[in-house]
C-alpha cells in the first residue's frame, strides 16, 4: 500500500469541498502512519509496489484546485459584503438603530469569511506541496519491473551455480538489489518529510452567531400576546352585522329614491311657475298693442270730423298761380285746429301735415301722405281704410 492510496478511500467526487478535506486528511494520516515504521526495513518490492499501484498525485491536485475555488468564493463574498456595508454606512443612505444593528451583525461574519478564505488558500498550497513531494518520491522509486528482473537473474544464477562459477555474478546481483532497497527507502523517507506539512491543517472556526436566539422567543411571545389581546374579534356576530348593513343599504336606496322624486316634483313646479309668468308677459304685450290700436282709432275719429262745419260760398275772381286759375283759398288756406289734430294723430300723415305748415306755394292742395295712409304698417284688429276729401274747386 502506497502513501497516496488512502486518498481514494473516502469515495468522494473530486472537485468538491468534502473531497478537499478527505484527500488532504487521508494523505496526512497515511504519511503519519508510515512515519512510525522503518521504510528501510521494507524490501524494495513493497515500497516500489506502493508508489506505483496508487492513483498518483491526481487526487492531491484535484483537492488543491477545489480549495482554490472555495477560497475564491469566500473572498468574493467577503469583498461584496464589505463593499455593500461601506456604501450603506458611508453614503448615509441608511442610518439609525436598525442600520447599526445590521452592521454589528454583519461585520463579524465578513471577518469570518475573510479568515476562512485565507485558510482555504493555505490548504490548497499544502495539497500542492504534498503532490510535489509525491512526484519527487515517485521519480526516485525503483520501478517494480527492474526489481523483478534482478530477482529473476539472481534465481537463475543460483540454480546454475553447480561448480561456483556464478558466485561473482550472484554477488553483483545482490549488490544491485541492495542499492534498490536503499533507493526506495530514501525515496520514502524523503516523501514523508516533504509531505509532513500536509498533516498540520489549521482548524476552521464555525461562523459567528449573527442572530439573537432569544429574540425569536420574544417574537413568539409578542405574537401570542397580540393574539390574546385581539381574541375579542372572534366573539363579534359578523352575520348580524352583515344583515344590518344590508338593511342600511336598503334604507339608503329608499331615501335616494325619495330625494329623486322630490327633485322631480320641484322641477315640475318650477316649470309651472315659468309657464304662468310667460302667459302674463304675453297678456301684457297684447294689452299694450290693443292700447296702441285704440289710439289710432281715436285719430281716425278725429279725421272723420273734417268737413262737419257749415258750407260757405262767395262770388269773387279766381286767383292766378302762373297761367293756371286756382281757387282763392289755395293761396292761403286756413289751418284749422281739427286738421292739425288729425294730421298729428296719424303717423303716416304727420310728416305731410308738418310739411304743409312750412309750405307757402300749395297750402290747400292734397298732400301725398294722405294717399299713402292706406299703405301703413299692419295693425292687429280690423283694418281701416281712410279716403281723403277733395276740396271743392271754383
Swiss-Prot record:
InterPro entries, per the entry: PPE_C (IPR022171), PPE_dom (IPR000030), PPE_sf (IPR038332)
Gene Ontology biological process terms from the UniProt entry: response to host immune response
Other comments on record: Was identified as a high-confidence drug target.
Family stated for the protein in its record: Belongs to the mycobacterial PPE family.
Protein name per its UniProtKB record: Uncharacterized PPE family protein PPE23
Amino acid at each position: 500500500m502506497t502513501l497516496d492510496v488512502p486518498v481514494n478511500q473516502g469515495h468522494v467526487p473530486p472537485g468538491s469541498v468534502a473531497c478537499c478535506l478527505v484527500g488532504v486528511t487521508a494523505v496526512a494520516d497515511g504519511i503519519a502512519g508510515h512515519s512510525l515504521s522503518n521504510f528501510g526495513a521494507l524490501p524494495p518490492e513493497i515500497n516500489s509496489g506502493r508508489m506505483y499501484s496508487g492513483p498518483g498525485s491526481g487526487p492531491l491536485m484535484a483537492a488543491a484546485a477545489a480549495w482554490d475555488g472555495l477560497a475564491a468564493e469566500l473572498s468574493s463574498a467577503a469583498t461584496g459584503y464589505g463593499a455593500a456595508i461601506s456604501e450603506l454606512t458611508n453614503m448615509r443612505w441608511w442610518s439609525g438603530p436598525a442600520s447599526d444593528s445590521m452592521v454589528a451583525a454583519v461585520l463579524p461574519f465578513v471577518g469570518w469569511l475573510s479568515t476562512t478564505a485565507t485558510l482555504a488558500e493555505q490548504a490548497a498550497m499544502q495539497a500542492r506541496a504534498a503532490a510535489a513531494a509525491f512526484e519527487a518520491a515517485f521519480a526516485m522509486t525503483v520501478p517494480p519491473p527492474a526489481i523483478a528482473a534482478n530477482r529473476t537473474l539472481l534465481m537463475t544464477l543460483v540454480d546454475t551455480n553447480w561448480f561456483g562459477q556464478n558466485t561473482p555474478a550472484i554477488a553483483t546481483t545482490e549488490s544491485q538489489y541492495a542499492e534498490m532497497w536503499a533507493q526506495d527507502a530514501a525515496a520514502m523517507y524523503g516523501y514523508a518529510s516533504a509531505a509532513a506539512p500536509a498533516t498540520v491543517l489549521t482548524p476552521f472556526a464555525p461562523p459567528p452567531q449573527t442572530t439573537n436566539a432569544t429574540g425569536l422567543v420574544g417574537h413568539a411571545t409578542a405574537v401570542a400576546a397580540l393574539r390574546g389581546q385581539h381574541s375579542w374579534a372572534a366573539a363579534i356576530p359578523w352575520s348580524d352585522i352583515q344583515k344590518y348593513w344590508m338593511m342600511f343599504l336598503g334604507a339608503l336606496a329608499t331615501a335616494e329614491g325619495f330625494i329623486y322624486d322630490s327633485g322631480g316634483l320641484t322641477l315640475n313646479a318650477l316649470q309651472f311657475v315659468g309657464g304662468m309668468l310667460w302667459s302674463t308677459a304675453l297678456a301684457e304685450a297684447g294689452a299694450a298693442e290693443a292700447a296702441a290700436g285704440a289710439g289710432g282709432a281715436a285719430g281716425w275719429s278725429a279725421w272723420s270730423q273734417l268737413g262737419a262745419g257749415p258750407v260757405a260760398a262767395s262770388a269773387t275772381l279766381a286767383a292766378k298761380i302762373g297761367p293756371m286759375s286756382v281757387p282763392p283759398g289755395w293761396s292761403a288756406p286756413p289751418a284749422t285746429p281739427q286738421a292739425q289734430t288729425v294730421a298729428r294723430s296719424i303717423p303716416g300723415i304727420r310728416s305731410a301735415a308738418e310739411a304743409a305748415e312750412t309750405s307757402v306755394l300749395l297750402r290747400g292742395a292734397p298732400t301725398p301722405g294722405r294717399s299713402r295712409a292706406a299703405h301703413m304698417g299692419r295693425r292687429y284688429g280690423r283694418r281701416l281704410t281712410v279716403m281723403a276729401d277733395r276740396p271743392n274747386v271754383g
